[in-house]
Amino acid sequence: MSKNNQSSYRSIFKATSLFGGVQVYQILIQIIKSKFVAVLLGPAGVGIMGLFQSGLQLVQQISSMGLAQSAVRDVSEANGTNDLQRIAKTVTVVRKLVWITGLLGLIVVACCSPLLSKVSFGNYDYTIPFIILSITLLIDQLSAGQRVVLQGMRRLKDLAKCTAFGVTFGLITSVPLYYWLGVDGIVPTLILNSVCSLILCWLYSRKIKVEIVQVTPMQTFEQGKQMLIMGISLSLSGIFSTIVAYVLRSFIQGNGGVEEVGLYQAGFVIMTTYVGMVMNAIGTDYYPRLAAINKDNIECRETVSKQGEIGAMILGPMLTFCLVFMPFVLQILYSDSFLAANDYVTWACLGMMLRFGAWIISYLFVAKAESKLFIKVELSANVYYLVFSLLGYRFFGLSGLGIAFALLYVVYFLQCYLIARKRYDFRFSHSFIKCYGVQLLLVVACLTIVMLFDGWLKYLLGCAVIAISCFLGIRGLNQRMNLLSFVKNKIAKK
């Protein structure tokens, strides 16, 4: 393999490993924090905090206009040109827009605080706390602006440090305040966490030297218009997903009861949070890298395929392990009473492998700022998911929801691929097809074993498939980036 290709694969692997580690650390800190909060505040306190956060997040989802995601594309594209004036202008526009949208969120929460209190708590007793908390929308949006610059300029180590230190300080500041003030510590803790995050983001982003340029309000509007359009599209996608999730949970509750909702929620969290962290880790570097070359379809094709190969070799072994040992995972993360979610999560594991294939293509639509196309694709995907899930649950219960999840991503994968093929002459490399295809077949094999066998035979055959998946993954990584030499060099440096 050529030096350039090896370097490219190593860069992808390093970024994925870096942010994968950060994701794991975030989850561990969140678990520890949740335990402390549960003990110190009790169920009522946790409920109050959750209602505050839900109300604020609802407004933030609308007022932020998706800038935290969409602006990364513009900063990355400017950075890819190495034009210092363009970089400076783009960063300045982003920083102005986050002030405007942050102030908008603050004003909306402050003005609607009586309504938020009434809707969230059923009374007006929490109007003043909502007014005080409105400042967090401005602070969080300013933090998001600094993270956009770090991600867009591909200062990945600084972004990782900022994230890791942020959750650490969140834990360190929260526990003493909750211990000292109890429920009364919720508002000051939420504000202090936001302030800590902003300070950390500012300390790291200020390391990036950007020229001082004058940008008029008209220039801000002109250059920011595309960011806002794409950002609103991303926000709408999130709103579609929220609506579908609400309708689906209501349907499950009406037909199966609240326990069924809990089982579905537990399985959904495992897939999106714990398994989904691989995709979150990949996306942090993949998105700005793809955005920087979005005008070159050939380079985009190569980048998507290379990213897909690395991701498949990491995700495949992870999903085969989950399929075989999911009952133990459910017991560790929840309890024996959640074992009924096993069939749902089993089918959803197949869905996650299919989702990854579609996901790496769908980033092309965002990187190329195809806002209308992105909205159509995401809206159709949500419609598919709702229809498949309602029918699946109606006829097969919780297992049907898992089957629906897998079926959704078969259709979504084909849809994304055909659109990208027609618009950008996109096609996967033979290397990706071979690598992804083998790992997908191993996931299907594991699913079949889990469905057909039980007891020691299931674990014997399942472990054999896991071993094959791991062997092929490690061998594939070693072939592409000389993994063993890479690891040895890292250890030697330490």
Predicted regions span which residues?
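Alpha-helical transmembrane segments of polytopic membrane transporters and translocases
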Residues: 35-36, 47-64, 93-96, 233, ...
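Interhelical loop/hinge segments that connect adjacent transmembrane helices in multipass membrane
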Residues: 1-12, 201-245, 285-302, 423-437, ...
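Membrane-proximal transmembrane or re-entrant/amphipathic helices at the cytosolic face
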Residues: 2-4, 447-494
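Membrane-interface junctions at transmembrane-helix termini in multi-pass inner-membrane proteins
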Residues: 138-162, 349-381, 420
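Alpha-helical transmembrane segments of multi-pass membrane transport and lipid-handling proteins
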Residues: 92-121, 171-172, 179, 278, ...
